């Protein structure tokens, strides 16, 4: 019965593009930073990380999606578009710990992929920290392959890329 209830709960989640200055977006981004601070061996200082500013997460430069369950924000993910290379960077992937296992990370990533394709992107890139093993598993299951480092993100240990199946 618990599995059925979890499936019903997951079906009630909505993943929508949201202004990064919105209160739900601020909550998700703050929660994301706090979790990284707890989980990374060295802690996490957003000022030391490669940026994903509000402007970079706002169309036409990029976008932010929020997963919302029964009126509460429970996850997020963002894209930064690089139109010159047709690459979109996946940033700020986070799902609240109490709703993990419902497939919300996959749904956020699928929405980001669809948004990237609709804007002419040929591939997605992302980087992640070694302490986020569940994130690496999600990315691999979603078709991302580990590649050589493509940036100098100080908190990254793994870099991934996914071909979106077309070139413009």
Feature names for model-found ranges:
Residues 1, 7-10, 14, 20-21, ...:
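C-terminal "cap" of GNAT-fold acetyltransferases
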Residues 10-87, 91, 96, 109-110, ...:
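Acetyl-CoA-dependent GNAT
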Residues 100, 117, 140:
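Short polybasic/polar patches that bind polyanions
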Residues 109, 114-128:
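Conserved GNAT acetyl-CoA-binding A-motif
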Residues 96-98, 102, 130:
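Active-site acidic-Proline motif in GNAT/NAT acetyltransferases
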Residues 102, 106, 110:
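Residues forming the Rossmann-fold NAD(P)(H) cofactor-binding site
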Residues 71, 103, 120:
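Conserved G/P- and acidic residue-centered "switch" motifs that form tight phosphate/ATP-binding loops
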């Amino acid at each position: 019965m618990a599995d059925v209830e979890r499936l019903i709960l997951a079906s009630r989640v909505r993943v929508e593009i949201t202004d990064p200055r919105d209160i739900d977006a601020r909550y998700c981004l703050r929660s994301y930073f706090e979790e990284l601070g707890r989980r990374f061996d060295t802690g996490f200082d957003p000022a030391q990380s490669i940026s994903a500013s509000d402007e970079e997460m706002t169309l036409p430069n990029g976008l932010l999606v929020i997963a919302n369950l029964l009126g509460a924000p429970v996850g997020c993910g963002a894209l930064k578009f690089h139109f010159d290379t047709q690459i979109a960077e996946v940033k700020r992937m986070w799902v609240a710990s109490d709703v993990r296992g419902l497939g919300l990370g996959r749904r956020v990533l699928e929405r980001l992929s669809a948004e990237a394709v609709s804007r002419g992107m040929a591939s997605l890139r992302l980087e992640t920290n070694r302490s986020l093993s569940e994130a690496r598993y999600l990315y691999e299951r979603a078709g991302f392959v580990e590649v050589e480092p493509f940036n100098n993100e100080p908190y990254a240990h793994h870099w991934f890329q996914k071909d979106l199946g077309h070139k413009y």
